[in-house]
């Protein structure tokens, strides 16, 4: 997954307890070596305004198709970049888990145009994801 190089804003996601109620969320993927990454997630609790920050380590597969992420030493989850724009400088990506339970739409800016978002949602639906379950993130 080509996620290195700065900040990505969370446009939409399948909500999970570890992110529920989070607004203004963004993530930074930082390449540490050829196969290792540091991942930092930041957002705010939508009710209290308190910062929510978490970090994880990631390891890229040999073919760079999968990112194995661990937020604690014994538990790993695998993620793939299931869709992205075709620009040399990626402006948006869709990251998904191995199952249909995990999905994030990330972008370089806090908002995407309606035209781009409709195209992304079409691609996501073709891959079998239920877009009705997407939670669109308030980027305050």
Question: Could you describe each region identified by the protein language model?
Answer:
Residues 1-140:
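A beta-rich soluble binding module of mature secreted/lumenal proteins
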């Amino acid at each position: 997954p080509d996620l290195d190089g700065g900040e990505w804003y969370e446009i939409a996601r399948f909500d999970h307890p570890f992110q529920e109620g989070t607004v203004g969320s963004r993530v930074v993927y930082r390449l540490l070596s050829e196969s290792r990454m540091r991942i930092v997630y930041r957002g705010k609790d939508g009710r209290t305004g308190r910062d929510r920050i978490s970090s994880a380590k990631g390891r890229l597969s040999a073919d760079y198709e999968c990112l194995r992420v661990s937020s604690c030493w014994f538990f790993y989850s695998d993620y793939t970049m299931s869709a992205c724009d075709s620009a040399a400088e990626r402006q948006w990506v869709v990251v998904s888990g191995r199952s249909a339970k995990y999905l994030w739409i990330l972008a370089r800016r806090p908002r995407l145009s309606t035209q781009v978002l409709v195209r992304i949602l079409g691609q996501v639906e073709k891959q079998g994801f239920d877009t009705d379950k997407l939670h669109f993130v308030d980027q305050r």
